[in-house]
Amino acid sequence: MVTISYILEIGEHELLKKGFIKIPPALHHRRYALLWGGLLISVTGSQMQLWALFWHIRTLSDQPIAVSGIGLVRVVPVLIFSLLAGVAADRYNRRSLIIVTQTTMMLEALALGLLTLWGHIQIWHIYLLTGIQAVAGAFDLPARQSLVPNLITRPEDLSSAFSMNSIAQDLGAVVGPGLSGLVISYFGQYEVYILNAVSFLAVLLALFLMGPIPQQIKSDAQVTGSGTLGSIKEGIQYILSKPIILSSMVLDFWATFFSSANTLLPFVARDILNVGAIQYGWLSASQSIGGVIADFILSQRAKIRRQGTLLFAAVTLFGIATVLFGISRVFWLTMLALAGVGAADAVSTILRNTIRQLQTPDYIRGRMTGVVQIFFSGGPQLGEIESGLVAQAFGTPIAIISGGIGCVIAVALVALRWPELRKYNGDEPILAGSKNPAAA
């Protein structure tokens, strides 16, 4: 057994040599490592801003539905633009698209900071600018997710890459909320938004350093008119023809729809646990602390077996931990429940992304991700609206507990409807490197 004293005695380099710790396989790919480093910094800033927005609106309004409005303005652009964003990720250079989207989000954060600094900020400003950021994000995610397999030359390292993506998200989400609480307490709300604007420069620098990225592009279709509609139809038909991908999307949507209660966390912190901004920051980071632990364990694995069984177990734990979060009236128990939510969510996210990307050819990967984005972004963001409405009518604890129960029921129904997802092992034929049949 490896103890802490043993680790301190022999040191990190010896642990690497003895095989207890190894550099994740994905980080051996230079271009991916550049992107990962930039994302780690940028996600920290974005998480600072996200949780600061919830807190900011809570200071401007005492109505839960006001905070839930953030979920609405974040989900509407996803529903409207995701299909077009998927086409764009297949039609245009993905690296160039990400440069445009990251720059747009940087300017949005800067505008939030300046409006807050000048004392002109109102709730509608927050909604409008968050909506603009959501439009950019709707185009950013399909391009960025689809770019990852272009940066990884060995398909067996793809699960490690998505584990590292999740580590970047969760490490940023650990540090970001904590920093957000500290910055708000000691410097001011506007400083959070300015710091987020600066953090986007890390991704832009990484994209510049990695240079051009090879990509399959279907050149015979047009960007407008029937070409675009035909491309969208092709992406949807592909998903409908692949039960593994379709079922993972349905599971993702309903689980996150019921168990999304992040917008209620300020009300749990202030009205149930009676804690301030710093403790709120730690509660916000708890999910990601659990996520980082799960991410690190999975990142060490180049190949994961029994992926379907593990996926269903993770989503079930996600629902159970959400119920515990709703029941808890103690600060440390709430942190523990949220850590369980984060760990389960990290495992399920890594597995879903790996399954989808490996089972989708490069030429259609952007469109697949665009359709999937409607489900995995729409689920939690619509869930934030649902939880706000239920909390308004029946109280915050009931909203959270009922959501966790709904998640567990959704897992059971998907397992019965699509047994092939539960039986998915991870050694099925890989389609990620398949050529565009239209170009053959």
PLM region descriptions:
Residues 64-65, 155-165, 277, 362-371:
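Loop-to-transmembrane helix entry/capping segments in MFS-fold secondary transporters
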Residues 38, 54, 145, 149, ...:
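Interfacial helix-capping/hinge residues at the ends of transmembrane alpha-helices
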Residues 123-134, 160-218, 278, 283-285, ...:
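Hydrophobic alpha-helical transmembrane segments
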